[in-house]
Amino acid sequence: MEAKAIARHVRVTPRKARRMVDLIRGKKATEAVTILKFAPQAAALPVRKTLESAIANARVKADKAGEPFRENDLYIKETYVDEGVTLKRFRARAQGRAARINKRTSHITVVVANKEGAR
């Protein structure tokens, strides 16, 4: 069984979020939460919250199906970061000019699944 969580329009650049996602890809879900909890990067928080949401979704899915739920059997099957909308802002510069500032957003997707053979 697999469960999915998507966080959309997260105010962190996709490049920085991808660094965090690459750290946890393929790992056990509980191990990945611990890694993200102690990562100093600001992008670790939204990735961790999305992962915890995917774990909670797996718990709900297992309860609905009447299956036993073991968090230790979950691993990160798939995780990726897509680019969201870019907020464009302008900063005043010298001599009446303006410089554009791009505030990028991300869509973070995490899919967790049971290990093959685990029941």
UniProtKB/Swiss-Prot annotation:
This is Large ribosomal subunit protein uL22. PANTHER family: CHLOROPLAST 50S RIBOSOMAL PROTEIN L22-RELATED, LARGE RIBOSOMAL SUBUNIT PROTEIN UL22M. Signal peptide: none annotated. One of its GO terms (cellular component) is cytosolic large ribosomal subunit. InterPro entries: Ribosomal_uL22, Ribosomal_uL22_bac/chlpt-type, Ribosomal_uL22_bac/org-type, Ribosomal_uL22_CS, Ribosomal_uL22_sf. Belongs to the universal ribosomal protein uL22 family. NCBIfam families: rplV_bact (TIGR01044). It comes from Bifidobacterium longum (strain NCC 2705). It comes from the Bacteria. GO terms for molecular function: rRNA binding; structural constituent of ribosome. Keywords: Ribonucleoprotein, Ribosomal protein, RNA-binding, rRNA-binding. HAMAP family: Ribosomal_uL22_B. GO terms for biological process: translation.
